[in-house]
Each structure stands twice: as C-alpha cells, then as structure tokens.
Amino acid sequence: MPRPAKGARLGGSAAHEKLLLANLAKSLFEHGRITTTEAKARRLRPVAERLVTKAKKGDIHNRRLVLQTITDKSVVHTLFTEIAPRYENRPGGYTRITKIGNRRGDNAPMAVIELVEALTVAQQATGEAEAATKRAVKEDALKKDEAPAAESVEDAKPAEDAPAAEAADDKGKDA
C-alpha cells in the first residue's frame, strides 16, 4: 500500500493529511482562491495541478479518478466543465501561491493559493495588438533615423541622374 512521503504530516496521520488535502482542493475549485498556511499551500499545489490535468482529459476514467479524491460531485462537475476548458492550451502551472505575511494569533506564515486565470481570446488579441503597435513605433523611429541620411544621398543622386535622363529624352526625340 503506497504511503505519503516520509517527514512531517499536515496535522497528524497519513489518512488525515489525505483528507485535509482533498478538502483544500475542493475549496480551491469551489472558490478559485483560498487562504491557508504556506506549508499546506505547498502540499496542495501538486495535488490540485494533477486533478486539473486529469480533468483536461475529460473521459470517464479520469472523472472517476478525480472522484476518488474529491467526493463532491458538484465540484467535480465544475472542475470538468468550467475549470478544465480554461486551461486547454496550458501545459501546466494552473495555480499560484502568494505569501501574505504571518497569522496574527500564532504567527504562522500564511499564503493565498489561487487558480491562475487562463488567457482569454480577447486578452491574447489585445496583447498581439500592443505588440504590433510597439513594432510599428520602432519601425517609424528607424525610418526617421534613416530618412535624414537617405535624403542627403537622394539629393545628390537626382543631380547626377538628370543629365542621363535628359540624354535619354533626347534620344527618344531623335528617333
């Protein structure tokens, strides 16, 4: 029978740790973000990421595997229908941990663990438009820098080209 990694358990036995992580994952998927201790957030992250990855696959086998961890069917339904499609094109990194200081009563280090919002199509389009604008500004700046140098060269060329153009016109008139 597999057991959790050696070392300190979160709150006691291995069974208690398993249930604690399942409840934390359930709350995370229900609310999108939860505040907990840093140790619990660090232990929750791989569990939650694994569940989202299974939900992205979307088949009945993976749904049953997720139901072994999270027993609330409504949360599992939300995970499979709303949360997993958001991360369709994201290979991992579905959660973010932000440290928020120490708890007032026992000075325990606290953190917020939240689901990272996937880029929407509108956000991607906005980002692409901003990048295109920046490129256009850079190109205009380069053209302006090159323009004074090019004008001085162009001013010299028409004077040299003018006699050749006149000679060509004369040849055309003679024919």
UniProtKB/Swiss-Prot annotation:
Cellular-component GO terms for this entry: cytosolic large ribosomal subunit
Q: Give the Gene Ontology MF terms in alphabetical order.
A: structural constituent of ribosome
Task: List membrane-spanning regions.
Answer: none
What are the alphabetically sorted keywords of the record? Ribonucleoprotein, Ribosomal protein
Key word Transferase present: no
What are the disulfide bonds?
A: none
Region of interest: Disordered: 127-175
Chaperone in keyword set: no
Query: What superkingdom heads the lineage?
Result: Bacteria
A GO term (biological process) for this protein?
translation
One Pfam family assigned to this protein is Ribosomal_L17
Q: Where is the composition biased (Basic and acidic residues)?
A: 131-147
Query: Subunit comment for this entry?
Result: Part of the 50S ribosomal subunit. Contacts protein L32.
Which NCBIfam families does the annotation name? Answer: L17
**Recorded family membership:** Belongs to the bacterial ribosomal protein bL17 family.
Q: What is this protein called?
A: Large ribosomal subunit protein bL17
